[in-house]
Amino acid sequence: MGLLALRQESKVHSPGPRRRARAVAARTFELSAFLVRVRKVVDVGARFKGRVTWHDACHGLRELGVRDEPRTLIMNVRETEFVELENADACCGFGGTFSVKYPEISAAILDQKIEAIETCGVDAVVSGDASCLMQIGGRLSRIGSKVRVMHLAELLAQT
């Protein structure tokens, strides 16, 4: 919703809806950006025993400029070792309808992401984007991987 309000405002031609879109966009944040930038919270008291990596979702990174905030939060989770994923900012291959229109290309992109995740020897891969989590989690499950897939909110809720 926030991304839509932020990026699609120019397509709203009436002043009333445009004002409402701006008002919504001003109060809508990606979770880690809200915690770190707005609330100045870097430690929520979470605990997760294991090695964790972060996948940068294309929209979060490129559209919203969210990169360091989730890493900061993860690094403050007790008993967690953060491992930077090789090419963490590379697409997972989902891209909305991209994976349907170009399934072979999508699968090849995902193969590279999965190889990077498996190579870094983590217990969990975390992201802030549900479609990335479904794409990555689906493949990890199909290959029988023990790597857990988690949304950032799920990791931060661990105690």
What are these regions (language model features)?
Residues 1-159:
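Iron-sulfur cluster-binding electron-transfer modules in prokaryotic oxidoreductases
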